[in-house]
């Protein structure tokens, strides 16, 4: 078993940064663009299981083929996911109580979801149950540097760090050793991981929560995060964040991508 940081796929067939910027506030878009690129050369044999599919936006941009099943416990987002057409089937259910039989799916993924789940051990165990033996399971989560690299914490201290953790709903910002133990208990082997998203990128994301307020008002009044999705309108934003959207693995990256496999 190789748990060392590994090289990531290098696949640039799509301009994921522009595609994400068209629909999302920039501080979410440039992180999702990095993550979209990672899946391009990863094997996802069908049937595929997406744990925490949300509104389906990420899958609709990341994958050319429809994902077999998207599961999410939240009523609003999963019904919104229908409009993207990225899934063959959508299921509203808790990840700890999946309605599928054991050994059903040939692969699975969970993109930037597991860090938000309080009952993480139960969800991982249930995910392992519905995956076939040797099925790959891919996921990405923030690590400890997600919180330790916050710029405003240097002035306001731990109170701000805890506040930021709460507003971003992060329950688990842990290092690979912790995730490896969780996965082992649930029935997975951890094959590879890499850190990504530099501390500087994390600070751009942090400040984006405040500079991105106009997008919130646009969403409230128009139903869209971005009013004008044209390339010329997004050129300056893309030019600025592109230098922070590198997919290269970094020793001090603030997020971690994992490749696990069902035992």
Where in this protein do the model-derived segments appear?
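Conserved N-terminal segment of class I S-adenosyl-L-methionine
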Residues: 1-101, 107-109, 250-257
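Short N-terminal helix/helix-N-cap motif within the alpha/beta-hydrolase-1
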Residues: 117-122, 149
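A short glycine-rich, Lys/Arg-flanked "PGG" loop and its adjoining helix->strand segment in the class I
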Residues: 121-136
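Conserved class I S-adenosyl-L-methionine
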Residues: 138-161
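A C-terminal cap/extension of S-adenosyl-L-methionine-dependent methyltransferases
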Residues: 154, 192-263
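Acceptor-substrate binding/catalytic loop of class I
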Residues: 160-178
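A SAM-dependent methyltransferase catalytic signature shared across enzymes that methylate proteins
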Residues: 179-194
């Amino acid at each position: 078993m190789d748990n060392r940081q590994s090289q990531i796929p290098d696949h640039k067939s799509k301009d994921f940064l522009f595609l994400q910027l068209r629909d999302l506030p920039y501080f979410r878009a440039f992180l999702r663009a990095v993550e979209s690129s990672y899946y391009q050369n990863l094997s996802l044999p069908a049937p595929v299981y997406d744990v925490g599919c949300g509104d389906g936006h990420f899958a609709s941009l990341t994958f050319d083929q429809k994902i077999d099943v998207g599961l999410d416990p939240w009523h609003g987002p999963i019904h919104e996911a229908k409009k993207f057409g990225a899934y063959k089937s959508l299921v509203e259910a808790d990840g700890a109580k999946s309605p599928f039989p054991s050994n059903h799916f040939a692969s699975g993924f969970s993109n930037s979801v597991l860090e938000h789940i309080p009952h993480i051990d139960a969800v991982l165990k249930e995910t392992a149950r519905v995956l076939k033996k040797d099925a790959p399971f891919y996921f990405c989560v923030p690590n400890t540097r997600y919180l330790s690299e916050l710029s405003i914490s240097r002035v306001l201290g731990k109170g701000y760090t805890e506040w930021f953790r709460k507003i971003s709903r992060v329950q688990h910002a842990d290092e690979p050793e912790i995730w490896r133990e969780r996965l082992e208990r649930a029935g997975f082997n951890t094959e590879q991981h890499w850190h990504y998203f530099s501390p500087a990128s994390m600070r751009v994301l942090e400040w984006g929560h405040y500079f991105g307020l106009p997008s919130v008002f646009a969403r409230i009044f128009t139903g869209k995060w971005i009013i004008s999705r044209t390339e010329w309108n997004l050129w300056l934003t893309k030019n600025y964040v592109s230098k922070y959207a590198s997919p290269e693995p970094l020793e001090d990256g603030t997020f971690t991508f994992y490749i696990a496999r069902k035992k």
